[in-house]
Amino acid sequence: MKDLKDRTVLLTGAPGGIGPHLASRLHAEGVSLVLSGRNQAELERLATTLPPARFIVADLSSEEEVEQLATAAGPIDILIANAALPASGELVTFSVEEIDRALNVNLRSAIVLADLLLPGMLSRGTGHIVLMSSIQGKMPTALVSVYNATKFGLRGFGLALGLELRNSGVGVSVINPTFVRDAGMWAETGVAPHPLAGQVTPDQVAAAVVRAIKENRPEIDVAPLGTRLAATMPRLVGSMARRIGATAFPPAAVARQVAKR
């Protein structure tokens, strides 16, 4: 999809984290935005800065509201499944409800939206699905086992769906950012990541999304070179990390994310 002008884009998780950066970059490409999130006031504020964007309030932890969102959005050319929860902490500290909520928001909603919007894309012979995963969808880390599960699942779904849709005119891209500074769930903790992980900016992530769509890239890791190389050999890196004691998500960050589960 070389030209995004006048394409209709559904962006979930629009008002928070890197959402506004994604929306702004896409708006600059001339797309028509459909913004979704839980906070109506924040959605309305964002939409007014990106005319003629419209917004739909939806809680993606609700199975019913996910389906309602797909219907209300209307024909969509590009789906960007960006909504996510931190889901940090030891597994034994999670309630069943918290696990379900993380799975619904981070994984199930993206799969269901793709399922419901894909027939229209196929009938038009064009479209794109972008799944915002994480470098933690390739490299497991202690204290984020539930989050890892959702991102590993999202990445696997996206890569497999891309194979299913080969030569259909509809592309699928998985975006794997490392820790994002200045915006998003990591930046909100105020904790510095391990130097091996590195950091990127929201604008770098937004640029990767646009590039993935235009070039029909199956997967892009948005991370410093060393982190990208490490992600290609997770078993070796995991062994090295255990030796130097760098296997766990920073406990201080976990403590600040628990309330958002």
Question: Where are the model-predicted features located?
Answer:
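Substrate-binding pocket helix/loop in short-chain dehydrogenase/reductase
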Residues: 90-91, 98-103
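Active-site helix of classical SDR
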Residues: 114, 150
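Residue(s) in the substrate-gating loop at a strand-loop-helix junction
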Residues: 134
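C-terminal helical subdomain
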Residues: 174, 194-231
